[in-house]
């Protein structure tokens, strides 16, 4: 990573919202231009996904959401500074529970009355966003924006669900957080966003400030060739007259489509899953299901093996059954 990563030692974080496997990052990026519109490829990409194009800065955060599965939020640095009465710094940010007498006007133009069930992002203790759900209007990016603070975080899904329910809205970001995302990819997603910003603007090299460092070492899932064949069965070739198992090449191709890294083994493969899929690809059966989905469920033989082996009780289960029968008969 060509960017400096700085540990925020003094940042105040709500322990319920930022648990040990979560992360909060904030990066100051100067030299941007809020009036710059997005190129056609970027507009098309986000609008095809049902997201309205706003400007290049906002569109890039939404693009990273779609590409990496990591929500990002951009604050206008000058507006933050005006709000708190001094130049905003990374140490001014915090994550806490809202207070009962607080309110926040959000990006949708509505004023929300806050309470202790809602988690907020603050700058010098002033709420500037509802964490993981929606940003505040007062510090939003507009055509006059020249500097931003880029937030990339992973919050506890339970706190996001509570906040979303309390204010009665669900956003693209909150829906991702509620399902749970991996903090292993957060700094990578922020880095990707900064790389894209560098393609459009001349910006000083930013520092990525983070609440903690996440172990990004690959964890491997053992994927057995014979297990794939047993679970999925053979492929149907030539209108059911010919059948065969998936070849190693076909299996590897599908895993590479998922972005996995592979190590060949005698039994099959050790599979390292990319961070933004590490929440849903956890077990061997998860990988097998994805292979089947990418190949096409309808391409596999639907007929069960013949003869079908009936299930039977083990000797221990038989002994337990007999014991229970005698107990019921008062022996």
Predicted regions and their residues:
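RNA/tRNA-interacting regions in translation and RNA-turnover enzymes
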Residues: 1-321, 325-329
């Amino acid at each position: 990573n060509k960017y400096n990563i700085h540990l925020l030692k003094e940042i105040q974080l709500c322990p319920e919202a930022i648990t040990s496997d979560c992360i909060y990052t904030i990066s100051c990026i100067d030299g941007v231009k809020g009036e710059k519109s997005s190129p056609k490829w970027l507009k098309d990409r986000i609008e095809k996904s049902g997201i309205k194009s706003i400007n290049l800065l906002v569109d890039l955060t939404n693009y990273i959401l779609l590409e990496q599965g990591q929500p990002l939020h951009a604050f206008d640095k000058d507006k933050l500074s005006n709000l708190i009465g001094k130049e905003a710094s990374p140490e001014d940010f915090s994550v806490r529970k809202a207070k009962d007498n607080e309110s926040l006007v959000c990006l949708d133009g509505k004023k929300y009355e806050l309470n202790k069930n809602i988690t907020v992002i603050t700058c010098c203790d002033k709420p500037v966003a509802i964490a993981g759900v929606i940003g505040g209007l007062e510090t939003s990016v507009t055509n006059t924006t020249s500097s931003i603070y880029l937030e990339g975080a992973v919050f506890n899904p339970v706190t996001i669900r509570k906040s979303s329910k309390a204010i009665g809205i669900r956003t693209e970001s909150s829906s991702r957080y509620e399902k749970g995302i991996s903090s292993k990819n957060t700094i990578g997603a922020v880095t990707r966003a900064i790389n894209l910003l560098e393609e459009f603007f001349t910006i000083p090299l930013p520092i990525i400030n983070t609440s903690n460092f996440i172990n990004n070492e690959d964890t491997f899932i053992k994927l057995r060739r014979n297990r794939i064949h047993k679970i999925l069965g053979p492929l149907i070739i030539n209108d059911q007259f010919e059948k065969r198992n998936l070849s190693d090449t076909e299996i590897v191709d599908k895993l590479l489509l998922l972005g996995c890294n592979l190590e060949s083994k005698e039994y099959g493969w050790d599979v390292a899953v990319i961070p933004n899929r590490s929440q849903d690809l956890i077990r061997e059966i998860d990988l097998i299901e994805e292979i089947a989905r990418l190949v096409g469920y309808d391409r596999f033989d639907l007929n069960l093996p013949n003869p079908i082996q009936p299930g039977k009780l083990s000797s221990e289960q038989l002994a337990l059954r007999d014991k229970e029968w005698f107990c019921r008969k008062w022996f």
